[in-house]
Amino acid sequence: MAAIAVIVTSGAPGRESLIATTLATALGFCYFVQKQKLDELRLFKDLFTDFNRRYDAMNAKLEDIRAGDRRIDSEPRSTLVDYFNLCAEEYLFFKEGYIHRGVWSSWCRGMVYYLRDDRIRQVWNAEMASDSHYGLTLNTIEQDASKR
């Protein structure tokens, strides 16, 4: 807006078109920033909805695994691997700045809940040996679970 003040007080010929151009540029920039923010919010909502839908679909199975006391065989293992992959995807989008800190911390507290079970932790450790989870580690989960 300082540029408009300089143009107005300069008395230069054609200053009206300079004012219009400056205003149009400023408004265009504001629109661009606002649209980008809205697009990011929409992406967050889509990711949040998708991640929660996928978690909800496996929640009962995860609870059954945690409540059980038998060895984890192929079917429960598959559910856990799907869950760990979901957690890794969430982490990837968190690192990229698309998942809010509070949401990520809440999800980490849920991960800690499951990973406290020794049998689930054994499957986690075996999966982490493959190093295919975008750098997500137990240490990261535990640290981020404590953040609000």
Show where each model-derived region lies:
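Short, hydrophobic/amphipathic alpha-helical patches that form generic packing surfaces
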Residues: 78-95
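Eukaryote-biased recognition of C-terminal alpha-helical segments
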Residues: 107-148
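Membrane-proximal alpha-helical anchors
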Residues: 10-77
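Alpha-helical transmembrane segments of multipass membrane proteins
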Residues: 4-5, 29, 89-90
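Short hydrophobic membrane-inserting helices
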Residues: 1-24, 130, 143-148
